[in-house]
């Protein structure tokens, strides 16, 4: 399935007293990577919301292998797990600048109608973009 690499530099404020990235920051890193994945596909998250579709996170899983630290440059590999329906699922691998695998993660998001506040199927234009090579 489609994949994309994003890069994030760890800021000092994102670390804890032990000098490692505070675990709560990983959700933000994954969101950055997801939005960049969509943009690389030609999808504007802002435009999608303006068209009445939102994508709240339904499930988030993280497995920490090694610690990310201040000033690390993280490479986040984002992959679509399978063709979306009502849900869209991503897997992630986060590496540091030394190409060490730090974190494995996955997220499941739900396509929702902003107007009706209920789940909907993945918009057809997204499915069409996923079919393109």
Regions found by a protein language model. Give the residues of each.
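HotDog/MaoC-like acyl-thioester-processing domains
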Residues: 2-6, 39, 69-70, 81-133
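Hot-dog-fold acyl-thioester-processing enzymes
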Residues: 2-57, 114-133
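Ser/Thr-centric signal marking residues that sit
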Residues: 15, 78, 107
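Intrinsically disordered, low-complexity regions of eukaryotic proteins
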Residues: 16-18, 61, 91
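Short, positively charged
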Residues: 45-46, 52-53, 71-74, 91-93
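Active-site beta-strand->loop segment that positions catalytic residues and contacts the acyl thioester
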Residues: 58-73, 79-85
């Amino acid at each position: 399935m489609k994949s994309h690499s994003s890069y994030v530099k760890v800021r000092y404020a994102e670390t804890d007293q032990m000098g490692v990235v505070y675990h709560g920051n990983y959700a933000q890193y994954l969101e950055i990577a997801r939005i960049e994945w969509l943009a690389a596909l030609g999808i504007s998250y802002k435009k999608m919301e303006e068209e009445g579709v939102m994508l709240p996170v339904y499930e988030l899983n993280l497995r920490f292998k090694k610690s990310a630290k201040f000033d690390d440059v993280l490479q986040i590999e984002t992959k679509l797990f399978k063709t979306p329906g009502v849900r869209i699922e991503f897997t992630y691998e986060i590496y540091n600048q030394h190409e060490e695998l730090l974190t494995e993660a996955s997220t499941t998001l739900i396509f929702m109608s902003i107007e009706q506040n209920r789940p909907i199927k993945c918009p057809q234009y997204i499915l069409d973009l996923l079919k393109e090579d």
